[in-house]
């Protein structure tokens, strides 16, 4: 199975307990195996017991240390729109594995137990189950952020092609870098734009002359092709972020 895109979050214990609801995730199970207390390592096995492909899930991780300290965190995994479109997902009857590495808060305070609970699962038909609404919201926010970043590239290339500059790739790159300097609204939610990723996209557009040459087209033709590809990707990601929670 291909590696999922993973994010980790530290959660306050009270908040985690408050967000959990009575509706359990029924489509999959999580089991901790290969636990090594000395190293603080373990493997989480996620089994898809539903009849649908799973494209994302969120795990609540509870770690107990020797000195009775309890840490709670969340691991979110998502196959992403492109991989899912290629049929890559956690298929029915399939088991996915994820390695955990827990760091002790201080020397000698070793890990005594690790518990993993599935708190949100998203299926390929865009429906979802969740016992933690905020965990499901974070999956939606992650997917929405990806769509927003691709749309930023679409806007940059569109503006470059509509302008008068002959250096189209550099123009698109500058538009992206200027956009990154714009402060994010204070009431914005979710992870927002990844500055590192968008700088990577800007660097990609700066290489437009080389990329166009490799396709044996002009720079304008190359960016026009890329615009079509990016528009399709943005639409795919936007649809991917539209998740419906299953009743019950």
Segments (PLM) and residue ranges:
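Asparagine-centered strand-capping/turn motif at beta-strand->loop junctions
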Residues: 45-53, 63
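Short, hydrophobic/aromatic beta-strand segments
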Residues: 53-60, 70-74
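A eukaryote-biased signal for long
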Residues: 169-248
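Intrinsically disordered, low-complexity Pro/Gly/Ser/Thr-rich segments with frequent PxxP/GP/PP motifs
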Residues: 67-109
């Amino acid at each position: 199975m291909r590696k999922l895109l993973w994010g980790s979050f530290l959660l306050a214990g009270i908040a985690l307990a408050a967000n959990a609801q009575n509706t359990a995730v029924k489509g999959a199970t999580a089991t901790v195996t290969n636990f090594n207390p000395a190293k603080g390592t373990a493997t989480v096995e996620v089994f898809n017991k539903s009849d649908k492909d799973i494209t994302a899930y969120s795990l609540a991780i509870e770690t107990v240390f020797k000195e009775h300290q309890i840490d709670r965190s969340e691991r979110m995994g998502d196959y992403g729109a492109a991989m899912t479109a290629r049929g890559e997902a956690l298929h029915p009857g399939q088991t996915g594995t994820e390695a955990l590495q827990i760091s002790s808060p201080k020397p000698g305070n070793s890990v005594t137990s690790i518990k993993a609970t599935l708190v949100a699962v998203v299926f390929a038909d865009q429906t979802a189950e969740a016992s933690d609404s905020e965990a499901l919201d974070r999956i939606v926010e992650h997917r929405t952020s990806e769509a927003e970043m691709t749309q930023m590239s679409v806007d940059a290339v569109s503006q470059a092609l509509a302008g008068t500059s002959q250096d189209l790739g550099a123009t698109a790159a500058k538009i992206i870098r200027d956009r990154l300097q714009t402060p994010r609204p204070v009431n914005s939610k979710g992870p927002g734009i990844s500055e590192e990723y968008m700088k990577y996209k800007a660097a990609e557009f700066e290489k437009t002359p080389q990329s166009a040459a490799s396709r044996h087209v002009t720079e304008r033709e190359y960016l026009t092709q890329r615009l079509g590809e990016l528009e399709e990707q943005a639409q795919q990601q936007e649809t991917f972020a539209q998740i419906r929670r299953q009743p019950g």
